[in-house]
Amino acid sequence: MDFAFTDEQRMIQETAQAFFTENATSERTRAAMAGDGMDARLWTDFCQELGLAGVALPEDIGGVGLGMVELAIIAEAAGAQVSAIPMLGHVMVTQALAAGGSDAQRERWIAALTGGEAIAAAALEDDVAATGDTLSGTVRFVPHGALAHVLLIANGEGAWLVEAGAEGVAITAHTTMDQTRPMATVKLSNVASDPLPHPAAAIAAARAGGMIVLSAEALGGAQETLDRTVSYAKDRVQFGRAIGSFQAYKHRLADMMIEIEQARSAVYWAACAVDEGTEEA
């Protein structure tokens, strides 16, 4: 596999980095954390102005027609700024629709989701019981569950779409350590659902997309942490010298850089594997 970015990928990287650096400021992130955990304006601008919310979706269903590598590039840029946006659930649900949804389901949700008009969350839990297409059960720790308009429910045997406002759906928001990714408990009591016709493909695609987003966001955060630490080491003076000049400090920074580069290789290798459909994916 060739890990060198193409010109198009570099352009996406530069665009995403500039967008999140300018808009996902610490002040806006703190404001989101003090509220419901989401920067709604940032998400709307990302979807509508940047137009990359459907980057890894096929063009024939309303996407950009690129792949997981491009998605990872964007998620890395978002993670670098600790962006308070519902990208994880969005990617999991849209990937599930692309891989295992019906034409009607895609028509109902893809445009609304990629346009920022609706928010999605994924609840994958084996304890959810299905009687036909009626669902019951409780799923805990659903990212952005309390903000979602549509939920992807999957229990390993089937996958269903449930509208958050449907009868029998009770969602309780929780305060967690990472306030930029608020969690919720979703309780289903005899809830009518819309089954995806190809659940195995949908679940596999949702999990793959979710893991790419999570790992790329973490990579972006790690790289930004290192960059800021290096910058601080050049400015902070102790014993008459910049602390970055001390050998022990240099060694720690070098170790961190090596670990981040190893993580970067793993993230983009995984993204390439998904795009190419290899067995390792």
Model regions: which residues?
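Extended, compositionally biased flexible segments
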Residues: I74, M87-L88
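FAD-binding core of flavoproteins
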Residues: L66, S83-P86, Q95, A104-D227, ...
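Short beta-strands and strand-loop turn motifs
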Residues: G54-L57, L88-V91, A121
